Amino acid sequence: MGMTIIDVEESMIPQLAALEEQCFSMPWTEQQLRSQLPDASHEFIAAVDGGRVLGYVGMMFVLDEGYISNVAVSPECRRQGIGDALIAEMDSRAKRRALSFATLEVRESNAPAIALYSKHGYVPVGTRKNYYDLPRENAILMTKFFTDKEDMHCEDTIL
């Protein structure tokens, strides 16, 4: 078969939770994932191949802002364009929703993820000190703007 990107379905939750376990020191549980899925202020997409979830992204929406809450790709599937395709698709959906911008946090030490987000136009805008546990580490806050700054009329706004 081949990889396709689809909306996450309830039946995929156990696979998403397993990915969380593989990828993060403080993973979301099945219950946490399940509670977000039916919420209209969240959107989850997955890269799948033959029913197997290879990776997924979750985004939360507040007014015209997006927050990428989850990005996970199976360790054995990394460096194959899956994260790239997922971020591109979520950015496309953010634009269709007319979002002004999207933000995310990433561990300072996660150079591959930082490079991926940078490739897609996310730029560092700040640091969250001691944001992560296990191990304790700062997060880099990254943002992508989907509108021109002139359109936002924010020349007098401190970002």
Residue ranges and their predicted role:
Residues T4-E76, I87-E89, R93, R97, ...:
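Acetyl-CoA-dependent GNAT
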Residues E9, G51, G55, G81-G83, ...:
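Conserved phosphate-binding and hydrolysis motifs of nucleotide-dependent enzymes
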Residues E9, S74, R78, R107-S109, ...:
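Residue-level recognition of the GNAT/N-acetyltransferase active site
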Residues Q31, E105, S118, V123-I140:
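Conserved catalytic-core motifs of GNAT/GCN5-like acyltransferases
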Residues R79-S92, A115-K119:
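Conserved acetyl-CoA-binding loop-helix of GNAT-fold acetyltransferases
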Residues Q80, R97-S100:
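Short coil/turn segments at alpha/beta junctions that flank glycine-rich nucleotide-binding fingerprints
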Residues S100, R107-A111, N130-L159:
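C-terminal "cap" of GNAT-fold acetyltransferases
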